[in-house]
């Protein structure tokens, strides 16, 4: 089992002057699979985006494989180390087509193979905004598989099964929990959470371990 360890120490995140995440301390061993659950608006997405450098208004320490990120080069390294399945695509940004999303993994061939296995190969020429929610999640999962083929050792997935049909949820859970990486998955899907090694819960910006 591969993967990198992830360590957070006294992490706080803000949106403007509002604290969204407070005093988060977390140690995840290399290769562990961690489910991050909790109430809507409790700070899960914000915390994951901070790990990736997509939310910069934070304080504290986040180390991935022992490395911090401060410079643009270090943040670029962080994003290569961490595959990412977002809850929703960034509005108005590239890539626009499925094929461009898959190519952004750094391993377009492997991502395209995964897209075929996940049943969305015929949609790769379509603009992302025309895909259904479940088709888009399948495309992002395929991109993540490509990113891992390209060298990512951590997968951060934000509600990756929320839009999938029942069979798709089972299939995605199998794939996610079988990848040779450290997995942090934000989810409200109890079956997926139960398949992880640890379950953490966020409430009002604070984190606690529940299983
Ligand atoms: N761009 C933003 N600007 C201002 N406030 C924001 C922004 N994004 C999130 N927030 C606020 O930050 C808090 C945490 O939001 P976040 O999306 O991290 O929660 P979450 O736990 O992922 O929620 P959910 O389970 O509903 O996806 C919420 O109160 C939310 O309203």
Regions found by a protein language model. Give the residues of each.
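Catalytic Walker B motif of ABC-type/P-loop ATPase nucleotide-binding domains
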Residues: 153-159
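Conserved ABC ATPase signature
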Residues: 127-135
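Conserved ABC ATPase "signature" region
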Residues: 109-123, 145
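Helix-to-loop junction immediately C-terminal to a conserved catalytic motif
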Residues: 52
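Conserved structural motif at the start of ABC-family nucleotide-binding domains
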Residues: 6, 20-23
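ABC ATPase NBD coupling module
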Residues: 68-83
């Amino acid at each position: 089992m591969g993967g990198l360890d992830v360590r957070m120490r006294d992490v706080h995140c803000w949106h403007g002057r509002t604290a969204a995440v407070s005093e988060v301390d977390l140690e995840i061993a290399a290769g562990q699979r961690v489910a991050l659950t909790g109430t809507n608006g409790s700070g899960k997405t914000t915390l994951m985006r901070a790990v990736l450098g997509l939310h910069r208004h934070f304080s504290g320490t986040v180390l991935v494989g022992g490395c911090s990120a401060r410079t643009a080069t270090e943040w670029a390294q962080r994003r290569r180390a961490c595959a990412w399945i977002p809850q929703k695509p960034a509005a108005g940004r590239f890539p626009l087509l499925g094929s461009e999303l898959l190519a952004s993994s750094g391993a377009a061939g492997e991502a395209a193979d995964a897209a075929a296995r996940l049943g969305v190969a015929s949609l790769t020429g379509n603009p992302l905004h025309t895909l259904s929610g479940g088709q888009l999640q399948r495309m992002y999962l395929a991109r993540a598989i490509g990113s891992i083929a390209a060298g990512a050792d951590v997968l951060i997935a934000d509600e990756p099964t929320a839009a999938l049909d029942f069979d798709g949820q089972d299939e995605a859970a199998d794939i996610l929990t079988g990848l040779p990486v450290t997995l942090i998955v934000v989810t409200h899907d109890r079956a997926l959470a139960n398949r992880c090694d640890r379950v953490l819960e966020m409430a009002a910006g604070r984190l606690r371990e529940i299983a």
